[in-house]
A protein has these predicted regions:
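Conserved alpha/beta-hydrolase catalytic His-Asp/Glu region
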Residues: 123-168
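Gly/Ala-rich beta-loop-alpha elbow adjacent to hydrolase catalytic centers
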Residues: 67-72, 76
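Conserved acidic catalytic loop of the alpha/beta-hydrolase fold
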Residues: 48-64
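Histidine-bearing beta->alpha loop at or near hydrolase active sites
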Residues: 42-43, 204-208
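Flexible "cap/lid" loop of the alpha/beta hydrolase fold
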Residues: 81-129, 155-162, 192
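Conserved loop-alpha-helix segment in the C-terminal half of the alpha/beta-hydrolase fold
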Residues: 179-204, 211, 216, 223-224
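Conserved HGGG/HGGXW glycine-rich cap/lid loop of the alpha/beta-hydrolase fold
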Residues: 4-46, 64, 78
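Short beta-strand/loop motif that positions the catalytic acidic residue
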Residues: 175-177
Length: 234
């Protein structure tokens, strides 16, 4: 067991985003004594993205908490079975079971508004500029423009791919429901949070509470960190 006093934090982004989507959280957590890193990956294949998350785990001390946003929830569900992972935090995220894909989980609930504002080109799924209001509508106009300018488009078949691993069945989990989400159905978020028996928090945010309500998200991370620290000391 590591002698560190606080778990490391590994951020795992969703589609139409990258590691900078956690920029309002990272400096505070670093100042509070955590090793922090944001995984980066190509959104080309699910297996490749999971492998990238596991490789990123090796760059910080163990144990670690994985924090997954949106599609990042699918990644931490698979990568979180790694013994270096002590807990999982889901932010408005998917959390497929062993017999589900990201797409099959989304399909269990009504289609959200953002999917009327996408286009497929060159084998990738791009968000149109007018889709940002459905993705991050509670940010300033300047921030929304930055979100679009930096959004990473996934491979068109990414959400239909599967890998093994259902970490929320064996690791302590926390979940942040975004009540005003127009990208992932809030009903889906509440369903998966209940199914995994997660410690659940809810806030009236868009799909990106880590950008629109960073203090709320930081408080949840602190609560999860304190719980993991108690387990580390046991």
């Amino acid at each position: 067991m590591s002698t560190q006093t606080k778990p490391s934090i590994v951020f795992v982004h969703g589609i139409w985003a990258d590691g900078s989507s956690f920029s309002k959280l990272i400096p505070t957590l670093q100042a509070e004594g955590h090793d922090v890193i944001a995984a980066q990956y190509g959104l080309d294949t699910l297996a490749g993205d999971v492998a990238a998350v596991k490789s990123t785990l090796a760059r910080v001390s163990s144990p670690a908490i994985l924090v997954g946003h949106s599609y990042g929830g699918t990644l931490i569900t698979a990568a979180g079975t790694d013994p270096r992972v002590a807990g999982l935090i889901y932010i408005a995220a998917l959390a497929p079971d062993a017999d589900e894909t990201s797409q099959s989980q989304l399909a269990k609930f009504p289609v959200t508004e953002v999917f009327s504002h996408i286009e497929v080109a060159d084998g990738r799924i791009w968000m149109k500029p007018d889709g940002v209001a459905c993705f991050a509508g509670d940010l300033t106009q300047e921030e929304q423009k930055l979100v679009w300018a930096t959004h990473a488009a996934p491979a068109a078949d990414l959400f239909n791919q599967k890998v093994e691993g259902t970490a929320w069945r064996s690791k302590p989990s926390w979940y942040i429901v975004a009540n005003k989400d127009r990208t992932v159905q809030p009903e889906l978020e509440r369903f998966v949070a209940k199914r995994m028996a997660a410690t659940t928090f809810a806030t009236d945010s868009s799909h990106v509470p880590m950008l629109s309500q960073p203090d709320f998200v930081l408080d949840v991370i602190r609560k999860a960190s304190n719980a993991v620290r108690k387990n580390m000391a046991a």
